[in-house]
């Protein structure tokens, strides 16, 4: 008798699971889950990696906080752009960096930005100010936090490090910024940026 009850229970559970899977598959929620699974499991492109000996031939600059001043360091680098700027950022609330990006757009530099989805709700995010300046700003909606802090200038210079583009990073936190002038390395970062953009549609 116990065996029959156990068998019945197993069949009943399998039946319920089958219905649930069927409903999910044909509902908007189920479709969203499936699409998110597809996006998150899309294999990333193969991007060239670099070792120290290769990078040692590049021109490298650094900035650290404290003391403050790295936002100006970054803004000055943005001011050197002549053709293009690609940014991938988690936090984007610094006024000086925002102004430098808007100035670059105004002088004819192609500026493209991908921001973490948290910027849609953050009170001090410069998302809308950048959009009003006609800068192409996309939201990185791929599952997980878009925690990159990267700026690619003229496809030959990379700004990266721990430094979020925020006032807190400049005034309160212990952070670092590194600028590497190397066209091949910049292309590696650009391919990663383009990959993230493509995965967001």
UniProtKB/Swiss-Prot annotation:
GO CC annotation: extracellular region
Cytoplasm among keywords: no
Molecular function GO terms recorded: phospholipase D activity; RNA endonuclease activity, producing 5'-phosphomonoesters
Enzyme type, top EC level: hydrolase
Superkingdom of origin organism: Bacteria
UniProt-listed Enzyme Commission number(s): 3.1.4.4
SUPFAM superfamilies with a match to the protein in the record: Phospholipase D/nuclease
Active-site residues, as the UniProt record annotates them: 147, 149, 154
Keyword Lipid metabolism applies: yes
Keywords, in A-Z order: Hydrolase, Lipid degradation, Lipid metabolism, Secreted, Signal, Virulence
Annotated Pfam families: PLDc_2
Signal peptide: 1-25
PROSITE patterns per the UniProt record, alphabetical: PLD
Cellular localisation: Secreted
Catalytic activity, reaction form: a 1,2-diacyl-sn-glycero-3-phosphocholine + H2O = a 1,2-diacyl-sn-glycero-3-phosphate + choline + H(+)
Residues of the PLD phosphodiesterase domain: 142-169
Quaternary structure and interacting proteins, as annotated: Homodimer.
Family: Belongs to the phospholipase D family.
Purpose of the protein: Could be a virulence factor.
Protein name: Phospholipase D
Gene this protein is translated from: pld
């Amino acid at each position: 008798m116990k065996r029959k009850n156990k068998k019945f229970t197993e069949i009943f559970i399998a039946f319920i699971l089958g219905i649930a899977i069927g409903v999910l598959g044909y509902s908007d929620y189920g479709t969203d889950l499936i699409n998110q699974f597809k996006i998150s499991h899309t294999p990333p492109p193969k991007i060239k990696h670099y070792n120290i000996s290769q990078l040692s031939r590049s021109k490298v600059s650094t900035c650290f906080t404290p003391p403050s001043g790295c936002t100006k360091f970054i803004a000055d680098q943005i001011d050197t752009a002549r053709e293009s700027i690609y940014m991938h950022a988690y936090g984007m609330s610094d006024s000086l960096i925002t102004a430098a990006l808007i100035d670059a757009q105004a002088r004819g530099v192609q500026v493209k930005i991908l921001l973490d989805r948290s910027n849609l709700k953050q009170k001090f995010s410069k998302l809308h100010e950048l959009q009003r300046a006609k800068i192409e700003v996309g939201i990185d909606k791929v599952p997980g936090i878009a925690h990159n802090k990267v700026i690619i200038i003229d496809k030959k210079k990379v700004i990266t490090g721990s430094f979020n583009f925020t006032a807190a990073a400049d005034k309160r936190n212990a952070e670092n910024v590194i600028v590497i002038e190397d066209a091949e390395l910049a292309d590696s970062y650009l391919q990663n940026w383009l990959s993230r953009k493509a995965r967001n549609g």
